C-alpha cells in the first residue's frame, strides 16, 4: 500500500469508529476486506488510527470532525503536508477542497484531548503536574517486558530477543526491559513463547516490586484477570498463589501463562473463597476508568462518562469491602488501579477501610512522567480482628 492508501484506509476505520463501532472491530472489518494489505500495512493503518484517536480533540480542531478531518488534522499536527497524500491518485484520498487547503487559525492544546467534563477534575487531582502529564499523554506509550527471573536473567533474555530481531534496553528496575525496536515480533519470539518474559508496564512492575508481600503463606489476587500481577508476585514471594475474578472467563489464559512461566497458581470461583480464606495478603487491582493507560487505550477516554465513573466508584467500594473480609488478622490488603483520578484511588480507601480500623501503609503514584502508565498503589494492614462490616 502507498502512504496515501494507508491514510485512506485509516479514514474509513475512523468513520466506522465515529459511527459507533469499536476501534478493534473497525480495524478487523477493514483488514478482512483488504486482503492485499500486508502486516506492515495493517500495522501502519493501526498506528494512524490510534494516533488520531489519542489526539482526537486536536486533530478535529486542525482538520474536522469526520474520519477525513481527523486524518487531515493528524498530518498537520505531525508537520506533514496533507496535500502530498490527499492526491486522489490510485487509492489515496481525494484532493483537498478549497476550504480544506487553508489550515484553521488555532494553536495546539493538549487539554483538547481530555474529555471536557473531566478537565477540571483531572487538573485538580494532578495539581502542579497536570500540564506536563497531559502533554505526555499525547504520545504513544513505551512497551515494557518483565523478565521471569525464575527461568532466566536479563542478559540471557536480551540475547534471545536479539536473535529474533527485537532490540531492548535496560531500565532502572532490575528485571525490566524497554522494547525499542520490532515490538510487533514479540509474541512470536522464543523468549515470549517459552515464558522468559511477560509484557507488563513498568509502573506495574515497580508497584509489585515495592509491595511488602509475605515471604510465605497464602496470597490471593482477587481481581486477577489475565494474571499478569499474579505472575509478578511469584517473582517476589514463595507464598502459595490463588487467583479469582468475578468474571471467570477473564482468567482463561492464566493457567497456560502460569505453566509457561513455571508457576503454580490455584484458580478460585467466588463460591470457593470463604472456605479458602483467610489469606495473608489480598491484592485488588480493581476495574477503573483506565485513565492512566489512555496513551495505550485512547478509545477508553472518549467512552468514559460521569455516570460510568460514578458506577465504577460504587463497584470499587464494594470490591474492597468484599475482598477485605478475606484477609487474615494482621494480614495485608493491597489496592491498585491504573487511574490518575483521586475518586478512584484515595477516596475509595478513605470511604472503606480507613473508616474500619485499618492502618495505612505506603501509598505510591506513578504517571507518564515516570516513563510509565499512570498507576496507584496503597497497602493497608489491620493489627487485630478485622472489622469489615458495613
List PLM regions with ranges.
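S-adenosylmethionine
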Residues: 1-390
Amino acid at each position: 500500500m502507498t502512504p496515501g492508501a494507508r491514510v485512506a484506509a485509516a479514514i474509513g476505520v475512523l468513520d466506522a469508529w465515529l459511527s459507533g463501532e469499536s476501534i478493534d472491530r473497525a480495524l478487523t472489518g477493514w483488514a478482512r476486506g483488504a486482503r492485499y494489505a500486508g502486516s506492515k500495512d495493517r500495522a501502519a493503518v493501526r498506528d494512524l488510527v490510534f494516533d488520531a484517536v489519542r489526539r482526537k480533540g486536536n486533530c478535529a480542531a486542525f482538520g474536522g470532525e469526520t474520519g477525513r478531518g481527523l486524518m487531515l488534522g493528524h498530518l498537520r499536527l505531525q508537520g506533514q503536508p496533507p496535500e502530498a497524500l490527499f492526491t486522489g491518485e490510485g487509492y489515496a484520498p481525494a484532493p483537498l477542497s478549497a476550504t480544506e487547503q487553508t489550515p484553521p487559525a488555532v494553536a495546539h492544546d493538549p487539554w483538547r484531548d481530555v474529555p471536557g467534563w473531566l478537565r477540571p477534575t483531572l487538573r485538580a487531582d494532578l495539581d502542579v503536574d497536570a500540564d506536563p502529564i497531559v502533554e505526555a499523554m499525547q504520545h504513544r506509550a513505551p512497551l515494557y517486558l518483565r523478565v521471569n527471573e525464575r527461568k532466566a536473567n536479563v542478559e540471557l533474555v536480551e540475547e534471545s530477543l536479539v536473535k529474533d530481531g527485537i532490540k531492548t534496553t535496560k531500565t532502572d528496575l532490575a528485571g525490566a526491559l524497554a522494547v525499542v525496536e520490532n515490538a510487533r515480533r514479540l509474541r512470536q519470539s522464543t523468549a515470549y513463547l517459552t515464558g522468559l518474559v511477560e509484557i507488563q508496564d513498568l509502573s506495574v512492575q515497580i508497584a509489585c516490586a515495592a509491595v511488602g508481600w509475605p515471604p510465605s503463606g497464602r496470597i490471593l489476587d482477587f481481581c486477577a484477570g489475565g494474571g499478569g500481577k499474579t505472575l509478578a508476585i511469584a517473582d517476589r514471594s514463595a507464598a502459595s498463589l490463588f487467583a479469582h475474578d468475578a468474571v471467570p472467563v477473564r482468567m482463561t489464559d492464566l493457567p497456560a501463562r502460569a505453566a509457561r512461566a513455571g508457576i503454580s497458581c490455584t484458580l478460585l470461583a467466588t463460591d470457593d473463597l470463604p472456605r479458602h480464606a483467610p489469606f495473608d495478603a489480598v491484592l485488588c487491582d480493581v476495574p477503573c476508568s483506565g485513565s492512566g493507560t489512555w496513551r495505550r487505550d485512547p478509545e477508553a477516554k472518549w467512552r468514559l462518562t460521569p455516570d460510568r465513573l460514578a458506577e465504577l466508584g460504587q463497584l470499587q467500594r464494594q470490591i474492597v469491602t468484599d475482598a477485605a473480609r478475606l484477609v487474615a488478622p494482621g494480614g495485608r490488603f493491597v489496592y491498585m488501579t491504573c487511574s490518575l483520578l483521586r475518586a478512584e484511588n484515595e477516596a475509595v480507601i478513605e470511604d472503606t477501610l480507613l473508616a474500619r480500623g485499618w492502618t495505612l501503609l505506603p501509598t505510591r503514584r506513578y504517571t507518564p512522567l515516570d516513563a510509565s502508565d499512570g498507576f496507584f498503589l496503597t497497602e493497608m494492614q489491620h493489627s487485630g480482628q478485622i472489622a469489615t462490616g458495613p
